[in-house]
Amino acid sequence: MLEHNSKLFCKSLSQLSAVASKVVAEDVEGEHFKQLLAKCIDTLSIYKSELRKLSCASKDTPPSQIYQLNETLYVYYKIVSQIASQVIPGLAEFQQIKMNSKKDSKDKELLEIYSRLVSALANDKQIGEVKRFIKNHSEEAAHDGTQHSYENGEFVSISQLHSLIRHDNDSSGILLVDIRPRMDFNDGHIKHNNVICIEPISFKESYTDSDILRKSLITASDREVDLFKNRDKFRLIVLYTDTDEHTKYYWQQLEVLQDILCNRSFDKPLHHTKVIVLQNGVNAWKEKYPMELKKIMESAISDIRTKPVEHNFHPMALSNNNNIEKANSPSHSQTTSFTHYPDAPFLTNGASIKTAGLVPNQLLPSTSNLTKALQQNDEGNSEPYKLQPNGIKNHRQESNNHANGTNCIVSSNGNNSVAKSGHPSINLDFAIGLVNLGNSCYLNCIIQCLLGCHELSYIFLTNSYRKHVNVNSRLGSKGLLANYFSQLVQKMYQQGKLQAYNNTNMESTAVHPTQFKLACGSINSLFKGKQQQDCQEFCQFLLDGLHEDLNQCGTNPPLKELSPEAEKMRETMPMRIASAIEWERYLTTDFSVIVDLFQGQYASQLRCKICAHTSTTYQAFSVLSVPVPRARSCTIYDCFKEFTKLETLEKDELWYCPYCKQRQPSTKQIIITRLPNNLIIHLKRFDNMMNKNNVFVNYPNELDLTGFWIDDYNGEMPKDNGVSLPLRGQKPPFNYRLFAVASHSGTLYGGHYTSFVDKGRVGWCSFDDVSWRKIRRKDEYITPNAYVLFYRRVNM
C-alpha cells in the first residue's frame, strides 16, 4: 500500500507480482514435486482465509485494511499460480511422472492433486475482482504506455494500443487476439501484422493452452496457427472483443482466455510475455481509427469455409408428357470425373417459390456429384473445373427439350460407388479393433459398421472432406466432429496396416478412440460419461453431426412454412412429384455428402374418414426405425409392413380436420418416398418402458424394397411450374446388399454391442471392441441379436 499527497493507493500489479516472484525464488529452490504441492495447498488455504476476511468487511472497515487485504490476496494467488504454472512444469521429476505409462498409486495421487490445484486456480471467480480493485486504486502511468511495464490482466486504452502498434517496428513485439466470431473478424479487425481470431464459442474454462491450439483454432489459417504456436516469443498479447450490451458473453470468454493464457499455459508458459486487455473493445477502435481496420476478402478465406454461391441455373418448364425421361437418356450424360468441388446451393434472400411455394426457383447440383467430387479431389488434383449440375442442362439443351416436350422429372445417375479411379494404395477394407473406454461398445460397433461404407471411409481417409467443412453452419460444431472423426479413421487405417504387416497382437495395436469420444461428449453431454448408450442414437448423432459440419447450406435461413393455398395444391399432386418438390426445398437448407450417402425421406399422411381430405408432412431420415412385431419370428419385410401399415385414429386420437373444422375419425400412414444409397435400418426392439423384444428378425443378404417405395406418378403435372425436378437416384428397382450389422445382447442398460462387417476380399468379420476375427460360418452375421442393419444399394 502506498500513500501520495495524503491519498492511499494500492501497489501496482507489477509491484505485487514482483513480491510474489521474490517469495517463490527464495522459498522453493531445490524442493521436490510433493513438497511444492504441499506449499501450494497451504498457501491456497491462507488465500481462502483472507478471502473470507474480505467478504466480511463492512462500511466501517478502514480503507487501508481493504487495500491491504486485496494486495495480500493477489500476492498469495500469484505465488500459487507461479509455482503451479512455471515451477512444477519445469521439474524433471514432474515430466518423468507425466511420461511414465506405468504410474504407481503415489504418482497417480500426486498428479490428481496437481490437477485439482490447477482446476481450483482456473475456476477461482474472486481473483478477477481483486485485480480490478487493485487496478482501479493504483496510480495511473503518466506516459503513453509504449514504455510501460505491463502486468497480466492490465487494461490498455485505445490510444495506448495505437501507440504500441506504431512503435512495434519489427512487428514481433505484439500479438493481437480477436475474440469474436470469425465472420465478424473477417468483416473488420484491428490492422496489424500479427493478429489471430479465437472464436468465443471455441473454448471453455477447463481448457489449457494446448487445448486452444488443438481444438479452438480449427477455423484458423495456417498463419494464425503459427502465430499462436509462437505466442511465448511476443512481449505483449493483447486481447480484445466487442463490448456491446448484446455481446456480454464475448467479454466473459475474453476473461476465460486471459486466465488460460496466464494460469493454464502448461505447454508454453508465458515467462516473459504479458497478457493485457483492450479497454472499450474493438467498437471504440472503429470509431477512433476507422482507417486502421482490415477486412479479409472472401477469396482469401475460401480454404477455411465454404461461402454460399448463387447459381445462375436456367429453370426448365414442366411438361404434361406422359412418359418419364429414362435415366440413360443421351441428353443427360453425366460427367464422370470432377476435379473441383461444386459450389454450395444458396437460397437467396429474395428467393421465390413457383406455383404458390411448390417448386424452388433454383435446382441444386446433384448430391451424388458432391460425393464424387469429394472422392476424386486428391491433394495434388486442384485444377479448377466448372461443375455442370446433374439433372440441369445448359440453355441450348433446355430450349431443345422444351420444344420436344421433355418431361418433368429429369433423371440423375444414382450410382454412388467409390470412383474406379480411386486411390490405388488405399485398402478400404482395413480391420482393426477399438478399445472400450468404459461402456463405449455402443460407439465402437457403430464406427466399425459405418466404415463398411467405402465412400465415407475414402472421404475422411484422404482429407477431401476438409474442403467442405462449413464453420459457419448454424447447427455444426465448426468442424470439430468431422476433424476428430477423420483423425480416428486415419489412425484405424494406419494401425490396421501395421497389424496386418507385422501380425501383431490385437490388443497392442487396437486404437483408443479417446479424443473422438471427448469431442462427441463436448457436443452432446449424453456421450460424455461412461454410461451405456443406445448405439442407434449414437449413429444418428454422428451422421447428423457430420452432416451439419459439412452442410453447404448450413447458413441459409430455415424454410418458411407453406401457405394454406400451397399446401392444398400439394395434396392434389401425385406423391412422387410432391415428395420430389419437398426434397428440393429440403436441399436448400441441408446439402452435404452425408445427405447423398445416407439420407432418405418418408411421408406421414393423415386422411379424414368423413371428407377424405389429406394432410401430408415429409420427413428426411438417416436412420430408419422400423417396429418389430411381437411374434415368435418375423422377417425384415414384416417390419416394413408394420412400419407402413394403415392405422385408424379414433376415440382419444381423433384428428382435427382443417376442412371439417372439427376432430374427426381418420387414418394415418407412413409412406416411403425416397430410399437412400446406403440404408440404415434400426429394429425397434425396445418399447417405451425399455422392455426388449428379442424376437428373431430374419433379414436377407439381398433386400428388395421396390414394393415399399411410392410410385404413383401418372403423367399428370401441375400447371405453371417452371422448374424440372431431378430424380436424384429415385428410379426403381431398389435392391440392397447387406454390408454391416450392429448386434445387441442383454438389456439396454446392462448389455453389450458387437458388430459384423463385410470386409470385401477378407470376407465378413466379427468385431468385439479390441478383438476381431473372420466369421466361423458363412451366415454368422444373420443373428437374433441384430439391432441396426446397414445396406448399400446395388444395380442402380
UniProtKB/Swiss-Prot annotation:
It catalyses: Thiol-dependent hydrolysis of ester, thioester, amide, peptide and isopeptide bonds formed by the C-terminal Gly of ubiquitin (a 76-residue protein attached to proteins as an intracellular targeting signal). GO terms for molecular function: cysteine-type deubiquitinase activity. Transmembrane segments: none annotated. CDD domains: Peptidase_C19R. The keyword Cytoplasm applies. Its main location: cytoplasm. Its EC number is 3.4.19.12. InterPro entries: Papain-like_cys_pep_sf (IPR038765), Peptidase_C19_UCH (IPR001394), Rhodanese-like_dom (IPR001763), Rhodanese-like_dom_sf (IPR036873), Ub_carboxyl-term_hydrolase (IPR050185), USP_CS (IPR018200), USP_dom (IPR028889). Belongs to the peptidase C19 family. This is Ubiquitin carboxyl-terminal hydrolase 4. The gene is DOA4.
